């Protein structure tokens, strides 16, 4: 997310990091680097050469120009995250669009997640240039676009992760209802709703974003109505609650209830295979929750601390700030791995994409026929339906080491 687009929150980390400012090596005490160009009117800790990209801390160095090592480290970090994130997410989207058997409700959510994550990581080159030059050279239009993309995709990515958690909870805990609810059509409608909800912050931020000429440099920043401190802090609080606290609670509760349900199914079936499947899915759940928390917690805590106390501008502070931002974006790189590349069906399609053969083409045609027959499932008792949903869930999650 655009570093200045971050209100002290972290798309980003959807993410938060996405909305944080990358403008300065270290954000001003109350600013959000990528997640919210909240600091349109922050003090200028960097001096005349500082650029406040709104909510993201300015990209300017703590004192004078950044050292060569610091600049190279930050640019390398951003470059790796950008390349890996774009490649992984575009590959996920291509495979889902290319292969008919991948057009399931779950994969439609994954497509939406990959789209949001790809757009989020696409803003990193702008943040890198802003950091190196100490000014925003891209004009007002791109300023508005980059900042709004940060917010839009941070929230869309996180909302989609929550949606997938609820979707899997319904599949396991309410298998009968899942037959009607977990359809590709409903998944598309929910994805559209997630983008509309993200507009609640994305559109206002787009109108608030602007460029300002100050001390020989141009800032891409957010402007707030008076009282400035009130609206700035309100944005930070909203981002923190809706982009971090609530998603963590929703994801944790849904997966926790799912594990409890799977345990009860295992006890009823008495199957050792179900026991192994439960352990496998439990590990997957723990990894998903842990990755989200690890990627987004640092930037949120950092922003809160900077809003409460003044942190001296040092090289370490600059690097750590941008590291937190990159960590939030890293979540966008890991999502394809967690939700797609570990899926056996996805890996099979990827192999077919890399090494197409006539047998693969024939297999794809036969898969279309089998999928059509699965659109009319037979009835069964609740335990059998739950076991069936568990088997489907296993197909969507690859075994973790």
UniProtKB/Swiss-Prot annotation:
GO terms for cellular component: axon; dendrite; endosome; neuron projection; perikaryon; plasma membrane; synapse. Residues 1-69, 133-143, 209-231, 308-315 are extracellular. The keyword Flavoprotein does not apply. Its main location: membrane. It comes from the Eukaryota. The modification Phosphothreonine is found at residues 373, 397. Phosphorylated. Differentially phosphorylated in basal and agonist-induced conditions. Agonist-mediated phosphorylation modulates receptor internalization. Phosphorylated by GRK2 in a agonist-dependent manner. Phosphorylation at Tyr-169 requires receptor activation, is dependent on non-receptor protein tyrosine kinase Src and results in a decrease in agonist efficacy by reducing G-protein coupling efficiency. Phosphorylated on tyrosine residues; the phosphorylation is involved in agonist-induced G-protein-independent receptor down-regulation. Ubiquitinated. A basal ubiquitination seems not to be related to degradation. Ubiquitination is increased upon formation of OPRM1:OPRD1 oligomers leading to proteasomal degradation; the ubiquitination is diminished by RTP4. The chain crosses the membrane at residues 70-94, 108-132, 144-166, 187-208, 232-256, 281-307, 316-339. Glycans are attached at residues 9, 12, 34, 41, 49. It is found in: Cell membrane; Cell projection, Axon; Perikaryon; Cell projection, Dendrite. Pfam families: 7tm_1 (PF00001). Residues 365-388 are annotated as: Disordered. A lipid is attached at residue 354 (S-palmitoyl cysteine). It is a multi-pass membrane protein. Belongs to the G-protein coupled receptor 1 family. Forms homooligomers and heterooligomers with other GPCRs, such as OPRD1, OPRK1, OPRL1, NPFFR2, ADRA2A, SSTR2, CNR1 and CCR5 (probably in dimeric forms). Interacts with heterotrimeric G proteins; interaction with a heterotrimeric complex containing GNAI1, GNB1 and GNG2 stabilizes the active conformation of the receptor and increases its affinity for endomorphin-2, the synthetic opioid peptide DAMGO and for morphinan agonists. Interacts with PPL; the interaction disrupts agonist-mediated G-protein activation. Interacts (via C-terminus) with DNAJB4 (via C-terminus). This is Mu-type opioid receptor. The gene is OPRM1.
């Amino acid at each position: 997310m655009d570093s200045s687009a971050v209100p002290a929150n972290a798309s980003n980390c959807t993410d938060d990091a996405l909305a944080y400012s990358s403008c300065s090596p270290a954000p001003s005490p109350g600013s959000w680097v990528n997640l919210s160009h909240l600091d349109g009117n922050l003090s200028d800790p960097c001096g005349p050469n500082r650029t406040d990209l709104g909510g993201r801390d300015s990209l300017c160095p703590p004192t004078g120009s950044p050292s060569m090592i610091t600049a190279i480290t930050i640019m390398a970090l951003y470059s790796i995250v950008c390349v890996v994130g774009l490649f992984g997410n575009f590959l996920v989207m291509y495979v889902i669009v290319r292969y008919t058997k991948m057009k399931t409700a779950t994969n439609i959510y994954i497509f939406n997640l990959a789209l949001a994550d790809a757009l989020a990581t696409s803003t990193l080159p702008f943040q890198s240039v802003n950091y190196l030059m100490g000014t925003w050279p891209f004009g007002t239009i791109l300023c508005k676009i980059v900042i709004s993309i940060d917010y839009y995709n941070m929230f869309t990515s996180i909302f989609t992760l929550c949606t997938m958690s609820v979707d899997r909870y319904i599949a396991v805990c309410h298998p009968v209802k899942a037959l009607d609810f977990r359809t590709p059509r409903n998944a598309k409608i929910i994805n559209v709703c997630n983008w509309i909800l993200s507009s609640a912050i994305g559109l206002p931020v787009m109108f608030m974003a602007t460029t300002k000429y100050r001390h020989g440099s141009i800032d891409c920043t957010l402007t707030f109505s008076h009282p400035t401190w009130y609206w700035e802090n309100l944005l930070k609080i909203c981002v923190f609650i809706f982009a971090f606290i609530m998603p963590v609670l929703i994801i944790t509760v849904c997966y926790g209830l799912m594990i409890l349900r799977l345990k009860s199914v295992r006890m009823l079936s008495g199957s050792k295979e179900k026991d192994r499947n439960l352990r496998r899915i439990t590990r997957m759940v723990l990894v998903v929750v842990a990755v989200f928390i690890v990627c987004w917690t640092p930037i949120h805590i950092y922003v809160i601390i900077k809003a409460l106390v003044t942190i001296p501008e040092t090289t370490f502070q600059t690097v750590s700030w941008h590291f937190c931002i990159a960590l939030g974006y890293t979540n966008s790189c890991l999502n394809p791995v967690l939700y797609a590349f570990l899926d056996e069906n996805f890996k099979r399609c990827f192999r077919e994409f890399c090494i197409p053969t006539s047998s693969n083409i024939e297999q794809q045609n036969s898969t279309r026929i089998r999928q059509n027959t699965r659109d009319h499932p037979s009835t069964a008792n609740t335990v059998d339906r739950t076991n069936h949903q568990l088997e489907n869930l296993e197909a969507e999650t690859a075994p973790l080491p």
